Amino acid sequence: MNEKMGRLTRRTLLGSAAAAVGSMTAAGRAAPAAMPLSRVRSEFLRFDDPADVFKQHFRMERDLVDREGSTLTWYHWTAFVIAEGRAPFPLMRYEGIEYSYFRVVAPLEYRIHAHNLSYVRDLTTGRFATTIENPITGRRVATRSTLLLNDPGTLASPRGFRNLAGDGKQYRQPYRLFRVEDNLVKLDSVRTAPPDWPVTHIENSCQWVDADLFENCTISSLPVHFAGSYVFPFLEWLEMGDAKGHMLGFFDGRKVNRPEDLPREFLERTERDHPELLEPRWGEFERPIKFLF
């Protein structure tokens, strides 16, 4: 920082702001200047080899390791109630993490397990909430943290995903499309749900990263940000009674290098309430698989 910039004070900043407003007012009376052309670059990325598509997807979503690795993502999301006969409305916020961990079990095939932890936050204040009012029933209910610890896991390869709760015969190829937007590479994708989950469940997301990082093949785990949505049933603790409908979540977040890098408030609560979820659950790999691969 040079000496002149170092002498900036609140008074000079306010004075500069006032002068800027005055200049904008004067400029508003003049003929508007023509905006320079700044056309958005938008292209689709195509890969001839399915193996290349899989590798790039794994770099974006997880980590293209040679043996085993893990990926930690952190997110905020807003939960909406979609009840029959009523306009959708936002009910609460969540803050949470997904920790996934994976091992190579065959050439370019990974066994993947994961767990999720999310805490309810007040929709207006953003503070952690122990109770919320359910507008459908008019009752105040106690909130529960959301823990997803029973995902059976998947096998992932260029051929598709095989859920470990199945017989291994069905490969499910996820929807995914890579595209370029200016200096970003984006991945639009739809995740497949375990076979025993509600048939209405679906999750889609968009992940993005700087193009120069994407093109650097030495980076096995790209530092992506992401946003997306998913549909899921009413949570049991909401006590919805006979109401028909479902929930809709909109989320956004990013990869985090390690648990110590999580936001302080979230990290401190998890260290107190669920410290075991701040590390991979490698014991999941000891569970036998029903089929050969």
Where are these regions (language model features)?
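N-terminal secretory signal peptides and thylakoid transit peptides that target proteins
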Residues: 2-21
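General helical structural elements
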Residues: 11-17, 33, 285, 291
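Short hydrophobic alpha-helical membrane-anchoring segments
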Residues: 19-29
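C-terminal segment of N-terminal export signals and the immediately downstream linker at the start
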Residues: 27-59
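Short, solvent-exposed loop/hinge segments that bridge or flank secondary-structure elements
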Residues: 46, 50-107, 130
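Predominantly extracellular/secreted and cell-surface proteins with exposed
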Residues: 85-216
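Extended soluble regions of mature proteins
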Residues: 196-243
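Edge beta-strand at a domain terminus
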Residues: 229-293
